[in-house]
Amino acid sequence: NTQTTYPVLYMYDGQNVFHSREAYSGHSWKVIPHLKWNSQIPDMMIVAIDHDGEQRLNEYTPWEMNPAEIEKTQQVGGLGKAHASWIVECVKPFIDQHYRTSPQKETSFLAGSSLGGLMTAYTGATYPDVFGVLGIFSLASWVNDEAFLHYIAQHPLATQTKVYLQVGTMEGNETDQGFTSKNVNQMYLDSSLWY
C-alpha cells in the first residue's frame, strides 16, 4: 500500500542493530528477525544511528564523565547534547520528509542500551514533544549520575510518554571496568533504579 505511513524506531548504536558482522560488540540485536517472529509488533521503520567508533564515549554522554568514576586523566564526554540535537533537528526531519512515516510523537520511538540508553533518556527529557516511546536498556547514567539526575528532575517527561526500562544482573564489560574499580553491575542497577 503506497498510502500507508509507518511508526519509526530510532536506535542508538546502529552498528549493533541488524547484523553481527557489523556490530562493534560482536553480536547484534537482530532486530529484523525479532520483528518478523513477533506478529504483535506493528510494521515500522527502523533507523539505526551509528556512532563514530572511538568517539562513542564523547558522542553518547551529554556531560563530561564524573571524575570520581574515571581512573584516567583525560576529559571524556560532553558531546551528547549536540548529538541529540542533530537527531531531532536533522535526522528525524530528513526521515519524515523522504519516507512514509507517521511523524507524530506517539509513533516516534527512541531506544538504546548502555550509553545509548543514557542518550535515549536524555533526548526524551530534552525533547518531550518529539518521541512518545522510549526504550532504555542497561542505563549507563553512572558516568555522571549527579548531572543526569539533576537534569531529569528539571526536565520531566510528558505524562503520555511511555518508557520501557530494562536492566540485567550481568551488566558491564571490560570497557566499563576500564573507567572504574567499582562494581559495574551494581552501578547499572542503581542507574536504572534512580531513573
Protein language model regions, located:
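Non-catalytic cap/lid and distal C-terminal segments of serine-dependent acyl enzymes
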Residues: 1-195
